[in-house]
């Protein structure tokens, strides 16, 4: 039997833990996915692979297949672009240097934003640190959670649309590479790059940019995601069919108390197999 057929679906390839902006440790993320019927899962924390070992061990104990992953931050003009990076080599020098730079920028940004917010609201740095776990890089979601905990906003959504909104008095932009560079780094690290939620509220990226990303090694698009919208979604369906690209579906789960639930969108077995076959950076962890 081919190696790529050793896994079992359903497969959810976009899950976050407390190592980035999720609320649960990696082991609990795997347990939550298992309770929702997921049998192959990828941990894709933002700009870090630090949760892989714990997630892999937990997945094995649950007879699940673990797909090592990451969600690499990128930026096109004013817009954030997220590149799902499956089965990369975590020790690749180029990718590692970039993720370290992004994480450092995220911490600096969080401190500056916290200082700005503290001028007008009853919020201190320790309130934000209380929302993080060991090993996590403090980011905007943790500031949002601190605002919720202090009763300054109702939920993360209100924080992101108000106090933390881009262009607002307290906002500071995060350093991130352009999407073509990000895709090239993932591909260069032996990984399989897939654009996350590509037809969301911000609309599609320019066709010329998508073409450049494809030339840099982009493998596909996450079309199964609650944020995607028509008509952009149909445009991408057509593109994926014409270019024979990988199509994924995922929950983008961030933990308990968040709306996205594991397994609400899944990836077809044939597409998971293509990801595994294409990757050279690392390998799935089978039960």
Language model segments and positions:
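An N-terminally biased module of ancient metal coordination in phosphate/nucleic-acid-related enzymes
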Residues: 1-79, 164-165, 183-184, 189-203, ...
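Catalytic core of soluble alpha/beta enzymes
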Residues: 230-231, 250-287
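Extended substrate/RNA-proximal surfaces in nucleic-acid metabolism proteins
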Residues: 2, 58-208, 270-282, 286
């Amino acid at each position: 039997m081919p190696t790529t057929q050793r896994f079992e679906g359903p497969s959810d390839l976009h899950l976050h833990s407390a190592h980035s902006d999720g609320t649960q440790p990696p082991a609990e993320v795997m347990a939550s996915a298992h309770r929702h019927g997921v049998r192959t899962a990828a941990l894709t924390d933002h700009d870090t692979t630090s949760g892989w070992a714990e997630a892999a061990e937990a997945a094995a104990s649950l007879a699940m297949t673990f797909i090592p992953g990451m969600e690499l931050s990128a930026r096109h003009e004013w817009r954030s672009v997220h590149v799902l990076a499956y089965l990369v080599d975590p020790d690749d020098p180029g990718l590692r240097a970039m993720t370290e730079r992004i994480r450092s920028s995220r911490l600096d940004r969080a401190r500056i934003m916290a200082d700005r917010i503290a001028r007008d609201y009853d919020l201190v740095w320790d309130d934000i640190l209380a929302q993080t776990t060991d090993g996590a890089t403090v980011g905007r979601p943790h500031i949002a959670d601190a605002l919720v905990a202090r009763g300054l906003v109702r939920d993360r959504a209100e924080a992101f649309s108000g106090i933390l909104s881009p262009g607002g008095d307290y906002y500071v932009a995060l350093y991130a590479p352009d999407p073509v560079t990000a895709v090239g780094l993932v591909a260069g690290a032996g990984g399989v790059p897939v654009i996350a939620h590509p037809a969301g509220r911000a609309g599609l990226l320019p066709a010329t940019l998508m073409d450049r990303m494809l030339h840099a090694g982009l493998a596909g698009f996450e079309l199964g995601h609650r944020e995607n919208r028509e008509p952009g979604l149909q445009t991408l369906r057509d593109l994926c069919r014409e270019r024979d690209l990988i199509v994924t579906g995922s929950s983008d789960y961030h933990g308990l108390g968040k709306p996205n639930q594991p397994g609400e969108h899944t990836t077809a077995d044939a597409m998971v197999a293509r990801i595994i076959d294409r990757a050279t950076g690392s390998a799935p962890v089978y039960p």
